[in-house]
Amino acid sequence: MILLNKKTKTRIKEQSIREAPSECCGLIVKNERNKPVVFPCENVSKEKEDNYRISPEDYLAASELGDIEAVYHSHSKEYHWD
């Protein structure tokens, strides 16, 4: 299990608000200092309001920064969490 600090949660929340009504998506990558880093990704789904699909280019770029620890996405039709 990964525990996210407040700064990380805030970055994901801000992305979800910016990209609404589309679902946002991204990856949590552990960098060389073993710290989790938010890596926002482009949602390339044809049905962005109901689904997400991370672009292969974003996945590759994130994997080059460190180990991918988690995938996140929003539920754009539901309440934004705090």
What role is predicted for each listed range?
Residues 1-68, 76-82:
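Conserved beta-strand-loop surface patch within small alpha/beta domains used
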